[in-house]
A protein has these predicted regions:
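Conserved G1/Walker A P-loop phosphate-binding module
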Residues: 1-75, 79-81
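Conserved glycine(s) of the Walker
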Residues: 16, 155, 246
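Conserved, well-folded catalytic cores of nucleic-acid-processing
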Residues: 27, 46-50, 84-87, 94, ...
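Catalytic P-loop NTPase motifs of RecA-like helicase/translocase cores
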Residues: 39, 62-64, 96-97, 124-125, ...
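Conserved C-terminal guanine-recognition region of P-loop GTPase G domains, centered on the G4
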Residues: 51, 75-143, 216-218
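Active-site glycine-centered loops adjacent to acidic/histidine catalytic or metal-binding residues
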Residues: 58, 119, 149
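P-loop NTP-binding site
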Residues: 184-293
Length: 293
């Protein structure tokens, strides 16, 4: 009998959810940086074997929203609780288990299997790990607790095996050749946004949205026009930099990553525009694809 199901990955910001997703899928589906709130959307990555299809879903980190964009991000995370066949709740050894208790209480009430993954165990010793496990067991008594290190791939194979055991008997939900639910344009915008997260500080990376206006592929090359939206003129100046140096660096590094991602030559043009206070506008958020429904 064939098995299939939705395995949703949730947890607080910066606990390694996207790194874990990429390790489980075996492809770089989600961008991952050292900064919190890197993931903004819910992204599916699909693992297929002859007997099984696992539809993983990476989600934004759980947070208390300060503006409408963060409200949408939280809604993506909460939607992952309602359609999971198996839930992966990711934490790290240094995290306060009581953080975002409201969300945790919702996880505790779930009737599907919950696997609590304590990530980055290479940063702890045996005694402290035992204390962490005990604390989490008191908060999520029905969850199975598995220590892992997503970055070092420790425990990932064991986790995949356990997920396979928990999945329901079901035909595949997606074509067996399909790797994700997102189109190519989505990954272009995410790769460009990843470079912005890496190369800019403070509020700039969080005030940015990237859209792809043109994506034309021929036999030898992909032609891409992208727009970086910021909220204020001053941010536009910072993104472009003195004599355009900063934007050129983003463009060059994005092109390299895109060529690696698509496996062919890329011609990339990036423009910068101001869309005032887009993070607080429902209309703009909808146009940028931040509607969780």
């Amino acid at each position: 009998m064939h098995k299939a199901g939705f395995v949703n990955i949730v947890g607080n910001p910066n606990v390694g959810k996207s790194t874990l997703m990429n390790q489980l899928v075996g492809e770089r589906i989600s961008i991952a940086t050292f900064k919190a709130q890197t993931t903004r959307h819910r992204i599916m990555g699909i693992v297929n074997t002859p007997e099984m299809q696992i539809v993983f879903s990476d989600t934004p980190g759980v947070l208390k929203p300060n503006y409408k964009l963060q409200e949408s991000m939280l809604a993506f995370s909460e939607s992952a609780l309602s359609d999971a066949d198996v839930l992966l709740y990711v934490t790290v050894v240094v995290e306060n288990p009581e953080k975002n208790k409201d969300f945790l209480d919702k996880v505790a009430k779930m009737t599907v299997p919950v696997l609590l993954l304590i990530n980055k165990i290479d940063q702890s010793n045996q005694n402290s790990l035992a204390e962490i496990v005990e604390k989490w067991h008191s908060l999520l008594p029905n969850a199975e607790i598995l220590p892992i290190s997503a970055k070092n791939k420790f425990g990932v194979d064991m986790l995949l095996k356990r997920i396979g055991e928990l999945l329901p008997d079901c035909p595949p939900y997606f074509d067996k050749e399909q790797l994700t639910d997102k189109p190519a344009r989505f990954f272009v915008s995410e790769i460009i946004r990843e470079k912005i997260l890496l190369y800019y500080d403070k509020e700039i990376p969080y005030s940015v949205e990237v859209t792809v206006e043109r994506f034309k592929e021929d036999e030898k090359k992909i032609h891409i026009n992208a727009i970086i939206y910021v909220e204020r003129d001053s941010q536009k100046g910072i993104i472009i930099g003195h004599q355009g140096v900063a934007l050129k660096k983003v463009s060059t590094e994005s092109r390299k990553s895109l060529e690696k991602f698509f496996g062919k030559s890329v011609y990339l043009e990036i423009f910068v525009k101001v869309d005032k206070d887009w993070r607080s506008s429902e209309k703009e958020l909808d146009s940028f694809g931040y509607n969780p429904e």
